[in-house]
Regions:
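Secreted/processed peptides and extracellular or luminal domains of membrane proteins
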Residues: 26, 52, 182, 194, ...
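Surface-exposed molecular-recognition determinants
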Residues: 152-155, 163-171, 180-184
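Extracellular C-terminal loop/segment signatures of secreted glycoproteins
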Residues: 180-199
Length: 224
């Protein structure tokens, strides 16, 4: 079941952290102010209860919320939405956070029956804006199936640049983002979670109920 009743109000800390993984292990989930290297303080939602905690939430989409996800490059760059509800943290901030060390990413998908599945990739990197915020992923593990590194023609998201309706960087003559929202498109997709309805995760569901995307330093670095 998609989570509701999230902790509101910023949780004050005595230190400034680079990301949610630096919070004390007994910290509750909720809103925190972090300051990644080379950028300003940033409000994020820290998920501290999922698989060891320390996750920084970069996307939440209930599928039926108010956001259309049909936004410009600049809006996707700096983020939009309500951190406690549907939102996109912002490509520039995602890039800054994930450039601090080796990160991993978890895609949480609520399927058509609202059952939670997940797809983990043990390495996650987003290049800078000059390089199109290109996505780099490691090895897959999970219950949702591999929806991002599938070796199928026109459906590979790994090593693809980010596209929006006003900045087309995909591998087709048209613009995938003009109909489906900002994402790392090939021509066009196996999975897409940045859309108002019709969230898709490869073979799992084409009408997924919702999604959450979380990142934290990789277990490769943590020694887990």
């Amino acid at each position: 079941m998609f989570p509701s009743g999230l902790q509101a109000g910023i949780i004050n800390t005595t230190k400034v952290y680079r990301d949610c993984s630096q919070l004390p292990s007994n910290s509750p989930s909720g809103l925190y102010i972090i300051q990644p290297k080379d950028t300003h303080p940033l409000m994020v939602y820290c998920e501290m209860n999922t698989t060891g905690g320390g996750w920084t939430v970069i996307q939440r989409n209930r599928g039926s919320g108010e956001l259309t996800w049909d936004e410009s490059w600049t809006t996707y760059k700096y983020g939009f939405g309500d951190i406690l509800q549907d939102h996109w943290l912002g490509m520039e901030y995602i890039h800054k956070i994930a450039s601090q060390t080796i990160y991993e990413i978890r895609f949480v998908i609520y399927d058509a029956s609202n059952n939670m599945k997940y797809a983990d990739y043990n390495m996650f990197l987003v290049d800078n804006e000059k390089n199109g915020y290109k996505l780099r992923l490691g090895s897959y593990f999970g219950t949702a199936g591999d929806g991002m590194t599938v070796p199928e023609a026109n459906k590979l998201h790994d090593n693809r640049k980010f596209s929006t309706k006003d900045k087309d960087q995909d591998n087709t003559s048209g613009n995938c983002a003009s109909g489906y929202g900002g994402w790392w498109y090939d021509a066009c997709f196996a999975s897409n979670l940045n859309v108002k309805s019709g969230l898709t995760w490869h073979n799992l569901c084409t009408k997924c109920m919702g999604s959450i995307i979380l990142i934290r330093p990789s277990s490769i670095c943590r020694g887990a």
